[in-house]
A protein has these predicted regions:
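Bacterial N-terminal signal peptides
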Residues: 9-18
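Cationic-aromatic interfacial patches
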Residues: 24-159
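Surface-exposed, glycine-biased beta-strand/turn segments
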Residues: 152-266
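Acidic, glycine-rich catalytic/binding loops that coordinate metals and/or anionic ligands
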Residues: 159-193, 200-201, 291-300, 319-349
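Flexible, gly/ser-rich surface segments that form the specificity/activation loops bordering the active-site cleft
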Residues: 218, 258-264, 300-314
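Short, well-structured beta-strand-loop connectors
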Residues: 248-258, 289-305
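Zn2+-dependent peptidoglycan hydrolase active-site motif and core
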Residues: 252-289, 314, 319
Length: 349
């Protein structure tokens, strides 16, 4: 028997009005026209490396890296400056046996976050002649008053010896007095003992030539045999690379050219400033290709190697000075010269 007509009419009106099918009832949350309900997600943990960490707690105001330096190696001194006005003119000194000062340098500001600890740094070099044993680093104010001290031990180190015969021309370069040599020496010395505030690089440095052949090493104890049979001694201040004339010589790090000119003893010479009191030197060049005052990027060509000045053959003499003191170039290629994070870790131990 067919359903009554009034029932069918009512059923049609129900579907036209959007009513649910009598055969299937879709859950309300599954309706296409109903937006899904989004439950609030649990707060996710931010990766530790992305969180803003608080500044480290300073437990000791003075830190020195490395802890057991060898003769010829640089020392980076970090000092947490007290919140006082008496923090200008600070200097760091390396004191050896019998209280003898081995080297000294001025502090400079290390750039950092505005809310972080205020750290100053000074870079020293352990002289190649320093005796092994107990030593200390002392922080002094402008009046010479000691503000902080830290003990350390200078490690032992052996240096090679070499004998170099000189012809008459090179003998004269070393032994005959010349006011021009004196003036050139005084001019360069004034530059190398100057400590400014410019930080051009943090290091590490890179060698200035693509050659592994070395003819002399840092700290070599030299004996010069002069043409008349007499002799003289010196300590080699850098590294000599046995490269042919015309080899490209490049900057070991970013820096500013503070000297680019011929000199009597060292021939065509270039000097770069990299950090306050830290300089690299390039001697005996055949050509100079930079000008004084220019800013140079690491790897830029400074000139070409040669044999100008007091040289027994073509080579490049590469030297590093720290507050006027000779320093081993290899130490500067091994690690950064200025590492604020390492200093802060040391201060927080």
């Amino acid at each position: 028997m067919s359903p009554p007509k009034p029932f069918l009419a009512a059923l049609a009106l129900f579907f036209l009005a959007g009513g649910a099918s009598p055969l299937y009832s879709r859950p309300a949350g599954d309706r296409p026209d109903t937006p899904p309900t989004v439950q609030p997600a649990a707060e996710s943990a931010e990766p530790a490396e992305l969180r803003e960490l608080p500044p480290p707690e300073i437990r000791t105001p003075l830190a020195v890296l490395p802890e057991g330096p060898r003769p010829g190696e640089p020392l980076t001194v970090g000092y947490h400056v007290p919140d006082t006005a008496a923090n200008t003119g600070l200097r760091a000194s390396l004191i050896g046996a019998q209280g003898r000062r081995l080297s000294r340098s001025s502090f400079f500001d290390i750039p950092g976050d505005a809310g972080g600890p205020k750290i100053k740094a000074a870079i020293l070099a352990v002289p190649s002649t320093a005796a092994p044993g107990a030593a200390l680093v002392r922080v002094e104010n402008a009046s010479g008053q000691a503000l902080a001290e830290l003990s350390l031990v200078i490690a032992d180190r052996n240096f090679a010896a070499e004998e170099i015969p000189l012809n008459q021309a090179n003998t004269n370069l070393r032994t005959v007095p010349d006011p021009r040599k004196t003036a050139e020496s005084e001019y360069l010395t004034a530059i190398l003992y100057r400590t400014g505030n410019d930080i051009h690089t943090l290091g590490p440095f890179v060698p200035p030539v693509m050659s592994a052949r070395r003819t002399s090493f840092f700290g070599d104890r030299r004996v010069y045999r002069y043409a008349d049979g007499s002799s003289g001694t010196s300590i080699h201040a850098g590294v000599d690379y046995g490269v042919p004339t015309g080899t490209a010589v490049t900057a070991c790090a970013d820096g500013r050219v503070v000297l680019a000119r011929p000199r009597i003893v060292t021939g065509n010479s270039v000097v770069l400033e990299h950090l306050p009191g830290v300089y690299s030197i390039y001697y005996h060049l055949d050509k100079i290709l930079v000008e004084e005052g220019a800013f140079i990027n690491a790897g830029a060509v400074l000139g070409e190697s040669g044999s100008t000045g007091l040289a027994t053959g073509p080579h490049l003499h590469w030297e590093i000075r720290v507050a006027g003191e000779n320093a081993d170039p290899d130490a500067f290629t091994a690690r950064p010269v200025l590492d604020k994070e390492a200093l802060l870790r040391k201060m927080s131990e």
